[in-house]
Amino acid sequence: MGLPLVPGNGSGAVLAANVGLSFWGGIDPTDGTVIDQSHPLCGQSVAGKVLALPSGRGSCTGSQVVLELLLGGKAPSGLLLSQSDEIIPLGVIVGEELFGRSLPIVRLSEADFAHACSSAHARIGADGSVHLSDAVATDSDSASDAHTPTRVTDAELAEHIQMRSDDLATLGGAHGAAAQVAMRILLRVARLQGVRELLDVTQVHIDGCTYIGPASLRFAQQLLAWQGSFKVPTTLNAISVDRRRWRALGVSPVLGEPASALGDAYVALGAQASFTCAPYLLESAPCAGENIGWGESNAVVYANSCLGARTQKYADFLDACIALTGRAPAAGCHLDAGRRARLVLRLDPCLQARVLGAGGALDDAFWPTLGYLVGLKAASRVPVLTGLEQVAPSRDDLKAFSAAFGTTASVALFHLAGITPEAPTLKTALGLSTGSTAHAVDQADQATIGQLDVAQITLSLEDLVQAYATLNGHVTGTESAAALTDKAGGVTGSVLDGQAIELVALGNPHFSVEECARLAEMLASSLQPRHEGVSLVITLGRATLEEARRRGYVQPIEAFGATLVTDTCWCMLTEPVVPPTARTIITNSAKYAHYGPGLVGRRLRFANLAGCVEAATSGRAPTGQPSWLAKSIGSTRAMHVGRYARTARGVRTIL
């Protein structure tokens, strides 16, 4: 017997993995095929199967994919989870509330989940019962389990939640049908989380404006038809096209028109046409302690971790419900208890010495690589990382770390001891002390940590090698990190070194003004032009583009032959912005390096910004490895780190 997150009946062959999966970027919403090339289920279809996963992870847009699968007839027949998850169930809840479509979701104990993963067939009951067998039932048996969702009454929704008079009025329809349905969805999520009350939010960032299929547009247009109106200041995430230039960029009307219509619908509901996946770069960025309702995984992680604002990782559609009501469930990272670290990560002495010894050679590829690794280790636990107290990352470093962390973790918050605002010390991050001096180095003793329900993991150089190699296209899933590491602890050479590059993809998350300045300086100092076979494309928000243009950064970038694209991001861009002839893409984004192969069917390489510029001028991927992974700091084979110098070959880097 499990806990029914969405009650219902369903059965089918079990498709199982012990690794979480982001439905967006991980499953094709048109046919249900797993497309995340790093996932063990890659290439298999979830349609009609009982899908067993620990949880979802990564993108808030997973709820959109669930709804697309439901309405398109390609959804699983049921879902079995072993950990908490709100993104996947939210897609089903919206399907029930607006479209009368559903599938059962049950959370199992770890032991029962392991049993389910080893079974051939599962039958889910509306009471949360799960019957497992080693024999696969016939299609007719599975079809007989399909069910029509039973509507939860308003009284049942309000029964265990403290509601204000205006909440009850909204639930009763006093503020219109859009707000009424939004309140029902909010209360269903609150009940799912065991929440007893709602709280006010000061602002919302909507991730659900990304067009991945007709279901998302139907949702937004229904809110408009009900004359919905957002109650709090609301910004919009990057949409699926450059709203002002998609025709000029050669995008087909098949995508351009519905994607634009979706963005327009949210603007009509009262949102600002910000169209950026980095809302923390806007003047409206929240302050520490401010309760907000944000979607977009990288933005949520950055707001919680680096700004000290408070938000759960709100699924697409739920973000709009919060904007319509100004209310959110009082749970997760909104509460002190949900922000305390429950995993301590330490750098082993070798890795710490290498990182600290790198000094100025600790380039901008380090932070997304580390974020990717920390997210993998953290999964659903809030982590605190120690060992970097003497390092001072920039805002862009933390942006890259947050995006990478949000790609591999399901949790919405991390702490870096001595760096992020709620972790001046390790003990503070664990909730053991307050008021400590910022950047104080605190080695909480093992006995103290041992009294808490806190796991501890040591990160090794080999772990970082594995993460970098995966991002850089070296590892297919069977190749070990040890095989990539030489006896001295550095990355070995690779057949990928010097590989031809046809596209340089920058701006995931959206470029900042400071990144525009760095790129402009690099390109202006280059003695070589852009390679004729390479496209350089940067995505960024409208506000950033305007400020960068005002400061004079845009001219050298455009003079180099780069294309600046606003309103959308690499998570949504396809052909023709991705050239049809491009076979290999290089990026400085760990998020895009992870999702890109599944999204656009190209091979991805990973480098820092300097390495990406080198690829744009040479048409080849950089050779060697970052100095912080080289077998000795200052190795002559260490690649593209440090500052630029003019040489006969044009833009090069020196340590």
Language-model-detected regions and their locations in the chain:
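Extended, charge-rich low-complexity interaction segments
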Residues: V136-D139, A143-A146, A261, L269, ...
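Acidic, Ser/Thr-rich peripheral helices and adjacent loops at domain boundaries
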Residues: G250-P258, A429-Q456, E547-D567
